[in-house]
Amino acid sequence: MKLHIIDEAERCLKCKKPLCQQGCPIHTPIPQITQLLLENRLMEAGEILFANNPMSAVCSTVCNHENQCEGHCVLGRKSSPIHFSSIENFISDSYLDRMEVPKIEKNGKKVAVIGSGPAGITVAIKLALAGYKVTIFEERSKIGGMLQYGIPEFRLSKSVIDRYKKKMEELGIRIRPNTVIGSAIVIDNLFRDGYSSVFVGTGVWRPKAIGIKGESLGNVYFGIDYLRRPEAHQLGEKVAVIGMGNVAMDVARTALRHGAKEVTLYARGKRISASSHEVSYTKLEGADFVFG
């Protein structure tokens, strides 16, 4: 792994106007990171990654890199782009456990964060480093939101979320699981209890219906509901998945792991929105594809 990422870093052209950085939604300074890696300045590279994006250890695994940083790499026009996701993952994974928590001067203000998904975790870490006393309110028993309950283990190890939780606790962030805001506790109660600000990061958990006949039948499930608790669903041996996005690939691969013998993905047209490597994995694991 280490030799691989060094080889990849050495391929970086250090473009004056790096398109890879422009292709990243949060503008990760990719040429700078690759150069620091080549200079054996691993911790410095990790510090820059986490300052830019505290969720670097997650994004380097689950982001759609081929449409973002790697998809914009100029080397990809004639050959293969730099595999920056592997570089970032190696650095951020190494840095996460070794990151030293700085001495933070508290400003005396309390902030409530509702929801512990990627947005909630990012905001909590940023605010804690800025001196705020942060409390996260999470309605489920574990933090992570969609990272915990929507992305399968084979795509994102849940141990990464546990490591984030440990680091957050070291930062003094308080986590209150199994706490629903909006029933017994409302936002007004939080302000009454001394919180100066409230961040709402509850995510988008409600699936979107497609409006076709039979959609409400008992053996028809939304992908997000299935991925949350696949062991609670009895799909049978023959499963149809409507859609060609990354969620559809996750559903198909999960179904095969939970006893389905035949899984077929259906699309209305010829377009596949899932990343090419997720499609490849899904095909390798035995799923079939049917296009309209």
Residue ranges and their predicted role:
Residues 10, 17, 112-137, 176-188, ...:
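Rossmann-like dinucleotide/flavin-binding elements
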Residues 105, 110-114, 162-212:
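Feature captures the FAD/FMN-dependent oxidoreductase FAD-binding
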Residues 198-201, 222, 241-242:
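Redox-cofactor binding/interface segments in oxidoreductases and associated redox assembly factors
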Residues 133-136, 140-171, 175, 252-292:
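Rossmann-like dinucleotide-binding cores of NAD(P)H-dependent redox enzymes
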Residues 1-110, 158, 200-217, 287, ...:
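Ferredoxin-type iron-sulfur electron-transfer modules and their immediate structural context
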Residues 92-98, 178-181, 219-227:
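Short gly/ser/thr-rich secondary-structure transition/capping motifs
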